Amino acid sequence: MEEYQVKIDTFEGPLDLLLHLINRLEIDIYDIPVAKITEQYLLYVHTMRVLELDIASEYLVMAATLLSIKSRMLLPKQEEELFEDELLEEEDPREELIEKLIEYRKYKDAAKDLKEREEERQKSFTKPPSDLSEYAKEVKQSEQKLSVTVYDMIGAFQKVLKRKKINRPMETTITRQDIPIEARMNEIVHSLKSRGTRINFMDLFPYEQKEHLVVTFLAVLELMKNQLVLIEQEHNFSDIYITGSESIHGA
């Protein structure tokens, strides 16, 4: 029986997930609370396993690294005596990870800046003159909303599992025959069309069955990947809303 696996391009690796957690939890990157970040990281990896997503081995390596750093942080600090009045403190176990995160953040920021500049150049060459007053209003409104990532969606799905009191991994294999993800995608699209308004992400999970919860989430991810839905969130930890894209309402 063929397994149904979903691999999301937005998963850029464990450093990307760690940066996401640091930003969302408003943590100082130079003073990472290892116990807290490890707990959140493992929760995300666990949720990805529940969903049977195609997880790269690097995520598991990072999990082991975080646990190692956490255990070293719990050990009593040792100081090596050099001279009578000089002591050398042991190296911070987080130092190497912090350096990697800072470098990765610089790379991400630079890539984002280049992409924005390229988009601006394309607009200046392709967009004809027009009245920008209404456009300015739309931009101002959109800037008030956060850019929702796949990691945000996984965090929202964690809330679903908690509300449904489902914490253990799936024991069954999701297959095309058992649970038609395409059919669930069509149901969500139909709901968006019939309502003509956005839907709260939590309202997509009316049933208790684990299989239905998982297939619904995977259906949303596929709709996101195919740009058939728009995802909105007003601020950190607030509710997430699903809106049909123009291609849905225009069909």
From Swiss-Prot:
It holds the Pfam family SMC_ScpA. GO terms for cellular component: cytoplasm. InterPro entries: ScpA, ScpA-like_C. Keywords: Cell cycle, Cell division, Chromosome partition, Cytoplasm. One of its GO terms (molecular function) is identical protein binding. GO terms for biological process: cell division; chromosome segregation; DNA replication. The keyword Cytoplasm applies. The keyword Cell division applies. It is found in: Cytoplasm. Belongs to the ScpA family. HAMAP family: ScpA (MF_01805). Component of a cohesin-like complex composed of ScpA, ScpB and the Smc homodimer, in which ScpA and ScpB bind to the head domain of Smc. The presence of the three proteins is required for the association of the complex with DNA. Participates in chromosomal partition during cell division. May act via the formation of a condensin-like complex containing Smc and ScpB that pull DNA away from mid-cell into both cell halves. This is Segregation and condensation protein A. It comes from Bacillus subtilis (strain 168). The gene is scpA.
